[in-house]
Swiss-Prot record:
'Tanmei' means short life in Japanese. One of its GO terms (cellular component) is nucleus. This is Protein DECREASED SIZE EXCLUSION LIMIT 1. It comes from Arabidopsis thaliana. The lineage of its organism: Eukaryota, Viridiplantae, Streptophyta, Embryophyta, Tracheophyta. WD repeats lie at residues 15-54, 62-100, 157-197, 213-256, 260-299, 306-347, 348-386.
Amino acid sequence: MSKRPPPDPVAVLRGHRHSVMDVSFHPSKSLLFTGSADGELRIWDTIQHRAVSSAWAHSRANGVLAVAASPWLGEDKIISQGRDGTVKCWDIEDGGLSRDPLLILETCAYHFCKFSLVKKPKNSLQEAESHSRGCDEQDGGDTCNVQIADDSERSEEDSGLLQDKDHAEGTTFVAVVGEQPTEVEIWDLNTGDKIIQLPQSSPDESPNASTKGRGMCMAVQLFCPPESQGFLHVLAGYEDGSILLWDIRNAKIPLTSVKFHSEPVLSLSVASSCDGGISGGADDKIVMYNLNHSTGSCTIRKEITLERPGVSGTSIRVDGKIAATAGWDHRIRVYNYRKGNALAILKYHRATCNAVSYSPDCELMASASEDATVALWKLYPPHKSL
C-alpha cells in the first residue's frame, strides 16, 4: 500500500509584499501575527482566514525580524523585533496595533538572531491561562515568579527590589543578542531595563573565553526550568555550530558547551517542559536534545540527517508530541518529538521557509516563507495518539 500524500494547507494567507520572516499565534484568541522583511506587521483571523490589521512596525529598510505573543506577556500585547536595533512592545486595540508602541528597547543590535520571550514550564494549557488571571501557582508548587540572580557587583538593595517586584507581578523577560554579537542580553519588558548580559564581564576584563572564537550568536532561547527555583536559563547557538547553556546565577561561565552542528546554529526551540528541545542550522542536521538541569548538561537524544542543508526555524507543539522545522529547501518537516521519527514533509511553499509555529491549543500550525505567504495546516490533532 502506497503512503498517503502529504496534506495541503487548510488556508494560505496572502497580503505581504515581501518575505515573511516570523509568525506567532495569540495565546488565547483566534489571531495570528506575522512580520515581513519590509517592516510590515499583520494580524490575521485564523477562522475567517483574512487580515484584520496591518501596520508598519519597523522601517522598510530593516524590516521585521521576529514577532511574539505569549500568555506571560498578556492578552493584549505583542512584541516585535526589527533589524533597526529595536524591540517594540505593542498594545492590541480592537484587533489592531496601537498607533505607538508601549515600549521601545534600544538594543543597538543589527544582527539576524531572533529574540526569545521567556518560556516558563507548564504542564497544561490551563496553567498558561491562569497566569493572565494573576495565579502564581503551577503544578508541583512552582511559581510563575522569575527571579534575577545578581553578580557580586550588584548591590543587595537592587537585588531585593528586583525580587520583590518579580514576586508582585508576572515579570516578562526577553533575550536578544547584544550590541556585541557574541553576547546575549536579557531585558525586562515591564521597565525597559537591561538586566544582565552573558557572558558577564567588567570593562577592564579581556573578552570572555567562553565565547571567544565562536563567532556571532545566531539563535537564543530564554527559559525557566522547574528545577531552577525561578532563575533564568539561556541556550545560545553560535556561528561555529556550538551551543552554550547558561544559568544566570553564574553569568561568567556557561554550565556546558556542546557542538552538535558543523555550521552556524540558526534555530533553537525548548519544549514547554524545559527538559529538552530541537535545533537546526546551516548544515544538514536536525538535533533533538535533552537538558538535565541537575547536572547542567545538554546531550543529543536524536540526530536526523537531511538530504538538503539549511534549517531556518524550529518549533515544538505545547503538548510535546510534535515538532516541525522550516527549511531552505522550501519544505516544512514534521516529526514525532518524543520518538524522533519523521511524520510528514510539506511541500507547499515555493521559496525558503523562514519560520514555523504552533497554536496554543495544538490544532493549527503556521509556516512563513520568502514567497510572501503564510500557510495554515491541521496535522495530527492533539486528542489522537500518534
